[in-house]
Amino acid sequence: MLDENKMKRINELAQKKKATGLTDQEGKEQTLLRKEYLQSFRQSFKKTIENTTVIDPEGNDVTPDKVKEIQKLNNIRK
């Protein structure tokens, strides 16, 4: 994930946008920070999904086939 300073800056810019609006430079900064945040979030979420195994109440592995294939490619699953 993003470091704490970047997260604070994203929130500062969001609050300023609501209160008084942003300059062009601040708007560009906000866009870049949001893109960086989304990229980091998606990467983290993808890793979480790739390392997840789904087990039903009977104890059967019901992990989606697409996830199983990715796990095999990454040597997570045999």
Swiss-Prot record:
- Main subcellular localisation: cytoplasm
Q: Where in the cell is it found?
A: Cytoplasm
InterPro entries xrefs: DUF896
Query: Which N-terminal residues, if any, form the signal peptide?
Result: none
Source domain of life: Bacteria
By sequence similarity, the record places it as follows: Belongs to the UPF0291 family.
**Keywords of the record:** Cytoplasm
Short name of one Pfam family for this protein?
A: DUF896
Q: What is this protein called?
A: UPF0291 protein MCCL_0996
CC per GO annotation:
cytoplasm
Native organism is: Macrococcus caseolyticus (strain JCSC5402) (Macrococcoides caseolyticum)
